[in-house]
């Protein structure tokens, strides 16, 4: 087991990793920007090193500064968390070159699964169903028109090297394709340095289902069930739950087995997530992409499976084999996560940085967890993602979990900044959400228009 690890991240995920490491008896090193000097993760870690100014490009994305901090503090491994450098194969390679273990998959696997075109080809080889679409990269609007004509409208344009909802456009008809292609390609070029696109047929109505996997260095792979992440705004998740009420036992076994095949086919190591689209009309599921890191929503899986995913990441990276077999994984109850963001729903969810003057995080009762890194008097910097907390609940069944989440959101108090807490409470209280009557289009096309009219 490692003696000391460095956490190359900030916010609640850095705090989450520090806590897991401490419970394993491992010393921790936090890195921080000048904007995060008073951040909670710097106070909880055994050591803290400043790596640059507030802008992420000069600090949390500064590979040389992070590796220098790791060498200086004699850290044996680096946990990248999510976002920032977590899926950067160059960073993983450079860690290896200086003799520091990257807590995640190899750079080779990141390159294969991080490129949507390569990942699609790999899944076809592994007998994992893929969405009908282009066979490779599409570089011009003319090529896109030809592919769309072949697979049929509506289509989804996606950046080959994309993620986080960037470089994605839904196109309903041929007349709109050229403009959408040019906009999405430019966005992809600006965000990822690669303007190549690919096309997929739109699956509608659909559920966004993702499967959590764990893989050790000996080639053993298991899955921990699925998460339903269908409630999304601008292709970014708002609320997640596990298990999905849209999936029965037979389909759960099939989609879990497909996720394991996907991971095995590339020699995957550590925690990862395979994302699928479930066609509710036919019951068929299709591979979308693989996230080669821990997910924001990993706590819902931890609640229903009883497995500490972050601890397993550290154990696997240290060379320990998985102690769990697939038959050991029994999902119990139902878990839901709501993301609490410093943003203003009344102004198109504009970020709301500032100083938190008063804070009460819900607590009490069985099956309630709040992952956060904020405290009274803390100033939210304007440079980073707006998420400030995650509320996660676990109940005997879905209704129990929904009621518990409503109670938790009702108790939550954050003053000094505007948050989406009331929006989340309205969403979780909506009769259609309570009934499970929603798909990936529900939030944007059904719930939000009426919500904004009400506001």
Stretches with model-predicted labels:
Residues 34, 54, 108, 136-139, ...:
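Short, solvent-exposed coil/turn elements at secondary-structure transition points
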Residues 29, 79, 101-103, 131, ...:
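Structural detector of well-ordered beta-strand residues that form the stable sheet scaffold
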Residues 135-148, 241, 314:
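A short, flexible low-complexity segment enriched in Lys/Arg and Gly/Pro that occurs
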Residues 7-24, 48, 71-73, 96, ...:
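ATP-dependent carboxylate activation and anion-phosphoryl transfer catalytic cores
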Residues 1-125, 138-146:
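ATP-binding N-terminal substructure of ATP-dependent carboxylate-amine bond-forming enzymes
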Residues 47-49, 111, 129-137, 168-169, ...:
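Structural signal for short hydrophobic segments within the conserved structured cores
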Residues 147-156:
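Acidic/histidine-enriched active-site and ligand-binding environments that engage anionic O-linkages
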């Amino acid at each position: 087991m490692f003696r000391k690890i460095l956490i190359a991240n900030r916010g609640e995920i850095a705090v989450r990793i520090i806590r897991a490491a401490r419970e394993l008896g491992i010393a921790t090193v936090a890195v921080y920007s000048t904007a995060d000097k008073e951040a909670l993760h710097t106070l909880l870690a055994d050591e803290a090193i400043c790596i640059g100014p507030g802008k992420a490009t000069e600090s949390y994305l500064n590979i040389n500064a992070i590796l220098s901090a790791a060498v200086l503090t004699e850290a044996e491994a680096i946990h990248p968390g999510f976002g920032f450098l977590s899926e950067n194969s160059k960073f993983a390679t450079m860690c290896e070159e200086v003799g520091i273990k990257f807590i995640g998959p190899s750079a080779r696997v990141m390159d294969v699964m991080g490129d949507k075109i390569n990942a699609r080809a790999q899944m076809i080889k592994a007998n994992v169903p893929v969405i009908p679409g282009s066979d490779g990269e599409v570089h011009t609007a003319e090529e896109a028109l030809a592919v769309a004509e072949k697979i049929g409208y509506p289509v989804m344009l996606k950046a080959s090297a994309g993620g986080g909802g960037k470089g994605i456009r839904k196109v309903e008809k041929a007349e709109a394709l050229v403009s959408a292609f040019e906009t999405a390609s430019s966005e992809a070029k600006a965000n990822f340095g690669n303007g190549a696109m690919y096309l997929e047929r739109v699956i509608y109505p659909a559920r966004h289902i993702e499967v959590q996997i764990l893989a050790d260095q000996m080639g053993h792979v298991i899955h921990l069930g699925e998460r339903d992440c269908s409630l999304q705004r601008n292709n970014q998740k708002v609320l997640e739950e596990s298990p999905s009420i849209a999936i029965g036992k037979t389909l759960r076994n099939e989609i879990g087995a497909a996720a394991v095949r996907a991971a095995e086919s590339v020699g995957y190591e550590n925690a990862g997530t395979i994302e699928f689209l479930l066609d509710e009309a036919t019951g068929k599921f299709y591979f979308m992409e693989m996230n080669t890191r821990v997910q924001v929503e990993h706590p819902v899986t931890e609640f229903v499976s009883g497995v500490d995913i972050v601890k397993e990441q550290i154990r696997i990276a240290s060379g320990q084999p998985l102690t769990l077999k697939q038959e050991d994984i029994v999902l119990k109850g139902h878990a839901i996560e709501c993301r609490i963001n410093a943003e203003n729903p009344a102004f198109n969810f504009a970020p709301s940085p500032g100083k938190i003057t008063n804070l009460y995080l819900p607590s009490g009762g069985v099956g309630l967890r709040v992952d956060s890194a904020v405290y009274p008097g803390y100033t939210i910097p304007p440079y980073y993602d707006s998420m400030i907390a995650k509320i996660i609940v676990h109940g005997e069944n879905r209704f129990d979990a929904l009621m518990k989440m409503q109670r938790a959101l009702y108790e939550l108090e954050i003053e000094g900044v505007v948050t989406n807490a009331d929006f989340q409470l309205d969403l979780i209280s909506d009769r259609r959400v309570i009934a499970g009557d929603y798909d990936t289009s529900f939030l944007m096309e059904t719930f939000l228009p009426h919500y904004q009219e009400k506001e």
